[in-house]
Amino acid sequence: YYENSIVVPGPETELLAKAAKDAGAWLSIGVSERDALTATLYNTNLFFSPEGEIIVHRKLKPTGSERVVWGDADKNYFPVAETPWGPMGSMICWESYMPLARAALYQKGITLYISPNTNDNDEWQSTIKHIAIEGHCYFINCDMYFTRDTYPADLQAQDEIAKLPEKVCRGGSCIVDPYGHYLTEPVWDKEAVIYAELDMSKVAASRMEFDVCGHYARPDVLKLVVEDK
């Protein structure tokens, strides 16, 4: 993991920033990040703007055995990118199961919720629909498709790899609108590029009924405090 983790910013991010600039597009990608001064690694999602600006989100709390590899996020919690379509933020995998972490993004007015993850099950599909409705935002579900043959042949522990199912992670990438409806159905058991046109007026329309951090909130009763650094 250490040898394949990248320093941010670094040569790899320069290439990605150039790609975003050349395409005139926003880019979101997950990486294993290495601190430039220490040996600590982070499970990280990066945003690149069309101007090449980098926005870094480190996973707040690694899940289960991930803690053997990655550390806790230590700064700049819950960053959002200001896009022409509203604030865009990300939660990595099971971060989305943390209600207060979701609320921290909702408080920033997030309209585009990006989630890189490896949750290839029906329960996760229920979760992302709930979040799209709860935050009245578009949920971009980026789910890994990964087979046993994807592992490099020279990787150690081949005996353990041989015991894995042929399809280690079945995918399930999809896009959900602010009402919890699929704009693109989950893609299972294959690689694919998914895309959709997003009607951003749905965000405002849906929030007229339920605005989780606005008119449907009770800040005099319930309050979230984020100890950011």
Question: How would you label these PLM feature ranges?
Answer:
Residues S5-E14, K18, A25, R34-T111, ...:
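Active-site catalytic loop in hydrolytic enzyme cores
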Residues I29-V31, T44-F47, P79, N141, ...:
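Short beta-strand scaffold segments in enzyme catalytic cores
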Residues L27-I29, I55-V56, F139-C142:
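General beta-strand structural signal in soluble alpha/beta enzymes
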Residues Y1-E14, I161-V168:
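A short acidic, glycine-rich active-site loop
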Residues I133-I140, F146-T147:
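Acidic, glycine-rich loop-and-strand cores that form catalytic or ligand-binding grooves
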Residues D22-A23, G135:
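Helix C-cap/helix->beta junction micro-motif
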Residues I92, N117, N141-M144, E197:
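Active-site proximal loops enriched in glycine and acidic residues that flank catalytic Cys/His/Asp
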Residues M144-K229:
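C-terminal beta-strand edge segments of enzyme domains
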